[in-house]
């Protein structure tokens, strides 16, 4: 079924990929991504693990409607999460290149 040394090579490749994925996940968790809303008046910075690191609200918004500011913070956070997920997909693609994964399968499992 497997050629000479095929199973051993397959296991070795799987182990190497697992190590690369672990390293990449650690790197991603350390990255910071900033999302914005309100033309940059609200900025939310999160790390690769989606933990909020910093929120910046332009002073001009402090006089505005509280609900609008809350909506802008939520929108900036959602933008930051989207950017973090896009960055994670990009980084993980380098680890999984050459692998034939089913459509929609997310790594890590």
From Swiss-Prot:
It is found in: Cytoplasm, Nucleoid. GO terms for molecular function: DNA binding. Signal peptide: none annotated. The keyword DNA damage does not apply. GO terms for cellular component: bacterial nucleoid; cytosol. It comes from the Bacteria. Keywords: Cytoplasm, DNA-binding. Homodimer. Belongs to the YbaB/EbfC family. Binds to DNA and alters its conformation. May be involved in regulation of gene expression, nucleoid organization and DNA protection. This is Nucleoid-associated protein HD_0326. The lineage of its organism: Bacteria, Pseudomonadati, Pseudomonadota, Gammaproteobacteria, Pasteurellales.
């Amino acid at each position: 079924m497997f050629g000479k040394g095929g199973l051993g090579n397959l296991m070795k490749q799987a182990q190497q990929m697992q190590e690369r994925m672990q390293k990449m996940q650690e790197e991603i968790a350390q990255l910071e991504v900033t999302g914005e809303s309100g033309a940059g008046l609200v900025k939310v910075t999160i790390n690769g693990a989606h933990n909020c690191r910093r929120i910046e609200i332009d002073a001009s918004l402090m006089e505005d409607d509280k609900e609008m500011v809350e909506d802008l913070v939520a929108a900036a956070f959602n933008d930051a999460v989207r950017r973090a997920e896009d960055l994670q997909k990009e980084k993980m693609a380098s680890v999984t290149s050459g692998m034939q994964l089913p459509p929609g399968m997310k790594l890590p499992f």
